[in-house]
């Protein structure tokens, strides 16, 4: 990305409410080529909102780190970029893909896919206010009648974007099953900057298929890695032609979960961190016996010691099902 060399071709995409510093560090430790902050409002940055600035917190994790900003006014996006230049990060990412109603209703996120010219002007302003590389995360388009990823990607490249990540669904599709790899291939053919393919990558074969079908330069993994940071190890090995790594046993998975939540509590305090940890914790229940009941348990987490009780329940459920938690093959990822 510009002057940044990535250690791996699989990177961790931004997700509001999930990609805080502890989550990013965990993914980087397991091989994410870069990580990105939760999306940050350009207006809030310009107005100096302290809560928003806290989302930028960087933790040394061995991988390049980007700050993602969102907004629909080019000049404000430029001012916001200037406001964060003082912080420690490696690149600026522009959100042109968020489908959330509260974001698109203001004209930002994936609503920008309706206006390629505005996309270009936003990138131009951001590039003008930073010495760091600028990247863009976008969608296939707004809806079936507005498939604009190619036009938007070309406008962004011309304005100075150093990389484009394409989620292969329209805003109308949200996260419904099925992606369109062809749109990623079309963007790859249309621009010279690196292109990342994004959407429905849950295993190494998904990543290989995306690269094979689209010739993209790398893959961006987001939801698929929640509760499964080892996905980066498996994908990296596959993309680099290396043997598949050994999967973690249940103890390793629970150790990772506990450390992640511990860091959340250390950084935010129990009152803020534990409600946020409920959603993170649910993802670690994937593939386990008794997962439905365990996920309900996740919804009650209030104190850090509640997590220890949950982890004890996880092991008990596996034993009741006749499984050996120490045998990695008995508790595989789905």
Question: Which positions does each model-derived feature cover?
Answer:
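N-terminal small/glycine-rich loop or linker at the start of catalytic domains
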Residues: 2-11, 43-64, 98-106, 126-135, ...
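Alpha/beta catalytic cores of nucleotide-metabolism and tRNA/nucleoside-modifying enzymes
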Residues: 6, 10, 16, 22, ...
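Hydrophobic faces of well-ordered beta-strands that scaffold small-molecule active sites
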Residues: 10-14, 35-37, 65-69, 92, ...
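Glycine-rich, positively charged N-terminal anion/phosphate-binding segment
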Residues: 15-90
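Active-site beta-loop-alpha junctions enriched in small/polar residues
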Residues: 15-17, 40-42, 70-72, 97-99, ...
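Alpha/beta enzyme core
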Residues: 29, 78-112, 116-195, 209, ...
């Amino acid at each position: 990305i510009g002057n940044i060399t990535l250690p791996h071709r699989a990177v961790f995409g931004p997700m509001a409410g999930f990609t805080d510093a502890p989550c990013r560090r965990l993914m980087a430790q397991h091989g994410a080529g870069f990580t990105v902050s939760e999306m940050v409002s350009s207006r809030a940055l310009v107005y100096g909102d302290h809560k928003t600035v806290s989302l930028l917190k960087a933790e040394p994790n061995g991988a390049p780190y980007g700050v993602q900003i969102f907004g629909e006014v080019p000049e404000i996006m430029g001012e916001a970029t200037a406001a964060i230049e003082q912080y420690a990060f490696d690149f600026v990412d522009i959100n042109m893909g968020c489908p959330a109603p509260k974001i698109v209703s203001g004209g930002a996120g994936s609503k920008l896919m309706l206006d390629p010219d505005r996309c270009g002007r936003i990138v131009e302003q951001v590039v003008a206010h930073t010495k760091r590389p600028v990247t863009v995360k976008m969608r296939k388009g707004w809806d079936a009648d507005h498939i604009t990823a190619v036009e938007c990607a070309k406008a962004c490249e011309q304005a100075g974007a150093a990389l484009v990540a394409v989620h292969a669904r329209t805003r109308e599709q949200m996260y419904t099953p099925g992606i369109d790899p062809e749109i990623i291939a079309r963007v790859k053919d249309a621009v010279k900057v690196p292109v990342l393919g994004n959407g429905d990558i849950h295993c190494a074969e998904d990543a290989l298929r995306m690269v094979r079908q689209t010739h993209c330069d790398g893959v961006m993994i987001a939801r698929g890695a929640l509760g499964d940071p080892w996905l980066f190890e498996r994908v990296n090995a596959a993309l680099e032609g290396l043997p598949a790594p050994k999967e973690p046993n249940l103890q390793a998975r629970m150790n990772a979960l506990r450390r992640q939540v511990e860091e959340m509590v250390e950084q935010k305090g129990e009152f803020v961190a534990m409600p946020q940890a409920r959603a993170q914790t649910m993802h670690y229940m994937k593939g386990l016996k008794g997962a439905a009941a365990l996920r309900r348990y996740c919804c009650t987490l209030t104190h850090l010691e509640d997590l220890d009780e949950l982890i004890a329940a996880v092991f008990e459920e596996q034993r009741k099902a006749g499984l050996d938690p120490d045998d990695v093959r008995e508790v595989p990822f789905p």
